[in-house]
Amino acid sequence: IVMPLADGDAVKTKITGCYKGSCGSTGELCGVFQDTNIGTLSLNTACGVYGFLNNIVSTNEAVPIATKQEVKTGSAKIISTVDEKGPQYYDVRIVRICNNDSSSSKNMIIEITDSSLIEKTGGIIQGMSGSPIIQDGMLIGAVTHVFVNDPIRGYAVFADNMLKVSEALNAERLLEKAS
C-alpha cells in the first residue's frame, strides 16, 4: 500500500547514524529535519516520491540513465548516506533481474557486498530507499525494499521506470502552467 500524497515540502536532513538491522528486524537511519526548504513534493508512487527542486542540482556528477535492457547481473555500487560522513559509494551485486511487468518497483534483487556497509547497517535498512544504483557508469535504479529475514538483500526499481513517472509528472505540470 502506498500512502497518497497531496503535496508537501522537501527539506534538508542531517543523518547522524543508524540502528543496525538483523534477521527479522529492519534497522533504520537516524537523523533530523533541518529548516531549509529545498523543493516541493507532489506524488508518492511504488517507484518513489516525486516533486520539484527549487534549484537545479549541479550536473558535474550527472550520469546517463540505463534502459532496463542495459541492466545486468553482477557488480554495481549504491550511493547512500548512513552516517554524518554524507553520501558514500558502497559495493552491491545485482543478483537477479525481474523482467516481468507485474511490479513497477521490484525489478531487481540486490545484495550488499560491501563489508563496511554491512558492519554499519547490517545490510539494507529503512531510510536507504531511493539510494541510487550505479553500474558501468550509468544509473540503473534505486533501492526500494529490504528482505526482512535477509537484510543483506532487497529489491530495487529500474531507473527507466522512475524516469517514466517523472516525465509524466513534468508533462502534467507543463499542462497546468499552460492553462
Predicted stretch roles:
Residues 1-179:
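C-terminal recognition in membrane/secretory proteostasis and scaffolding
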